[in-house]
Amino acid sequence: MRLDRFLANLPELSRRDAQMLIAGGHLRVDGQVVRDGTHEVRVFSRVELDERLLQAGKPARYYMLHKPMGCVSATRDPQHPTVLDLFPEDLRDDLHIGGRLDYNTTGLMLLTNDGQWSRRLTLPGSRRDKVYYVETEAPIDQRYVDAFAAGLHFRFEDLVTLPAQLEPIGPRCARLTLHEGRYHQVKRMFGHFDNKVLRLHRERMGDICLDPQLPPGAWRPLNAEEICSV
């Protein structure tokens, strides 16, 4: 919400009053004097009118989780444990997932209460790299590398996937870099060759890498550099 609209919502202030207070330098947002009425006020913003606190602002929270197998990427599920069940109950409030993983896919998952941040993370236009370690039933050869780089046609959506980079690191394992997120995309890409994915593990999203010190099921807060990378 714009700062001038935020102030105009106060019952004792008119829109004209709000404009004059802003122009006079009476407003501080997160400790900084703001004279621009279009300045954005978020639920996380601390807003002060002179010495009066108008909004304390709730803390923005950002977490990295090493998702284990056997839990769903959801906030609630009637049948299965969810990734939120891995957090203490007092931390679960308002958390949502930025970039889901399938039930038996493991690896990096990001959770936050900051909707704008998670939208930047997952917007299709962001082309943010996602890196996966993949193990398959049948051997992986150069045909896969070439086809993934050219893009594969997905009949259901009638689209061609963006070029992806596949790096074989063993007869039946590879590292795959995607620049988009489609439904079951990795499994469908290997399915183009009738090759079943046996293990799928996400290692990185954008510039955020899974912390090697985190065992499956463990989590930690993101540091400032990781938060600002999105």
UniProtKB/Swiss-Prot annotation:
Keywords: Isomerase, RNA-binding, rRNA processing. One of its GO terms (molecular function) is RNA binding. Residues 1-68 form the S4 RNA-binding domain. SMART domains: S4. PROSITE patterns: PSI_RSU (PS01149), S4 (PS50889). One of its GO terms (biological process) is enzyme-directed rRNA pseudouridine synthesis. It is an enzyme of class 5 (isomerase). It catalyses: uridine(516) in 16S rRNA = pseudouridine(516) in 16S rRNA. GO terms for cellular component: cytosol. Its EC number is 5.4.99.19. InterPro entries: PsdUridine_s_RsuA/RluB/E/F_cat, PsdUridine_synth_cat_dom_sf, PsdUridine_synth_RsuA/RluA, PsdUridine_synth_RsuA/RluB/E/F, PsdUridine_synth_RsuA/RluB_CS, RsuA_PseudoU_synthase, S4_RNA-bd, S4_RNA-bd_sf. Disulfide bonds: none annotated. It holds the Pfam family PseudoU_synth_2. The active site is at D102 (nucleophile). It comes from the Bacteria. Belongs to the pseudouridine synthase RsuA family. Responsible for synthesis of pseudouridine from uracil-516 in 16S ribosomal RNA. This is Ribosomal small subunit pseudouridine synthase A. It comes from Pseudomonas aeruginosa (strain ATCC 15692 / DSM 22644 / CIP 104116 / JCM 14847 / LMG 12228 / 1C / PRS 101 / PAO1). The gene is rsuA.
